[in-house]
């Protein structure tokens, strides 16, 4: 395998696992389930909460920075950035980012309306009421504040929450001419500046809509691509260090969650940096040693899983919880793991059926070229 193929396949190998990690994080973020006005508090399940802290320490916040880095690297890879190139790439991103973003948020709005109008709404502790408004409709595509259901939510995410990454990526892509111009003149200083803003932004309690993380990692990837940096060489130098740091910081984050919770934010940011190097180095190592290879189907399904899982995972979790009624940490953990497997399985099946019987529809909703 050539170095170019190894670099490309190392990125492709990461796509599906990263999507599953995002799904897992979103499912395990649900630490209490309300049914018929009664909320189950999972603090009563100590082993389950320890597993949750482990997932927080090792996986939360890791996937999207890697996605951003890959996006920045690929955007500028192997092309001369002329006016015609930008126009072509912008047109492509309309198909691969903007159209799916609009469609999947519309799906979320429709699902919200169906949920509010369904008979099950009356079993909620505080039944929602559909209150249509232009402001509420538009907020669903940027930062949804609950207007469509007559409530107030302080949030930085669109209605289909995982799509914040796509929203931010659209904005970053629009800035790529300026990013290219600045990188050509400032080189890595722009990367360092954006890295500092990302690293220290929590100290200032400013709502960034997560644009800090998107810009930093996209620009970092763009810098390496524009300057023809070989990731196999640059990241490979830190293989052992990244493994040690990633594991050590994950453990430290779990311990800090118990004893020094104020430090978890800084620890997590350092671990995100180590995690990026670790993930790419591990992917390249697995391929180079023939331990695994890229599954084209899973890699191509990763974006579909990412944009769609938020619409069904929470509902599947609630159904599974109500059906099983777990009475211990182990049984609760079994419920959560089962929901991850069921959700991934259903979405892969849906992707397969769409690819086989409605490929044109899949191209539109999944941003496939």
Predicted ranges, named:
Residues 6-42, 63-75, 95-116, 171, ...:
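Kinked, hydrophobic transmembrane alpha-helices enriched for aromatic residues
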Residues 37-53:
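Perimembrane loop-to-helix junctions flanking transmembrane segments
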Residues 75-83, 116, 177-185, 201, ...:
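Structural signal for the C-terminal ends of transmembrane alpha-helices
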Residues 97-168:
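Membrane-interface helix-loop-helix regions
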Residues 170-195, 206, 223-241:
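Solvent-exposed interhelical
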Residues 219, 226-297, 301-304, 311-336:
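Alpha-helical transmembrane segments and terminal signal-anchor/GPI-anchor hydrophobic tails
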């Amino acid at each position: 395998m050539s170095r170019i193929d190894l670099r490309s396949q190392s990125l492709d190998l990461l796509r599906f696992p990263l999507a599953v990690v995002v799904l897992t994080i979103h499912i395990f973020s649900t630490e209490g389930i309300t049914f018929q006005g009664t909320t189950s508090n999972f603090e009563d399940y100590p082993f389950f909460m320890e597993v949750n802290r482990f997932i927080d320490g090792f996986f939360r916040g890791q996937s999207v920075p890697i996605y951003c880095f890959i996006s920045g690297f690929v955007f500028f890879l192997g092309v001369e950035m002329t006016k015609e190139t930008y126009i072509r790439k912008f047109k492509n991103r309309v198909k691969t980012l903007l159209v799916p973003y609009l469609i999947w948020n519309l799906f979320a709005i429709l699902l919200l309306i169906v949920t509010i109008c369904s008979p099950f709404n009356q079993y909620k502790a505080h039944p929602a009421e559909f209150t249509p408004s232009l402001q509420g409709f538009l907020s669903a595509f940027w930062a949804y504040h609950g207007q469509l259901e007559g409530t107030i939510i302080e949030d930085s995410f669109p209605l289909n929450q995982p799509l914040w990454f796509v929203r931010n990526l659209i904005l970053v892509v629009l800035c790529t001419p300026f990013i290219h111009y600045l990188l050509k003149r400032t080189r890595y200083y722009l990367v360092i500046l954006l890295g500092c803003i990302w690293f220290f932004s929590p100290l200032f309690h400013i709502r960034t809509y997560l644009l800090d993380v998107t810009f930093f990692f996209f620009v970092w990837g763009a810098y390496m691509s524009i300057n023809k940096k070989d990731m196999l060489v640059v990241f490979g130098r830190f293989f052992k260090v990244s493994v040690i740091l990633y594991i050590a910081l994950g453990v430290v984050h779990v311990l800090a969650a118990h004893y020094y919770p104020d430090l978890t934010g800084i620890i997590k940011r350092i671990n995100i940096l180590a995690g990026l190097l670790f993930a790419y180095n591990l992917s390249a190592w697995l391929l180079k040693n023939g331990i695994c290879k890229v599954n084209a189907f899973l890699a191509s399904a990763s974006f579909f899983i990412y944009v769609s899982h938020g619409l069904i995972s929470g509902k599947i979790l609630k159904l599974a919880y109500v059906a099983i009624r777990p009475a211990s940490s182990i049984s609760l953990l079994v419920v959560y793991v089962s929901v991850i497997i069921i959700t991934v399985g259903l979405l892969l099946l849906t992707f397969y059926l769409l690819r086989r019987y409605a490929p044109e529809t899949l191209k539109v909703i999944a941003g496939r070229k």
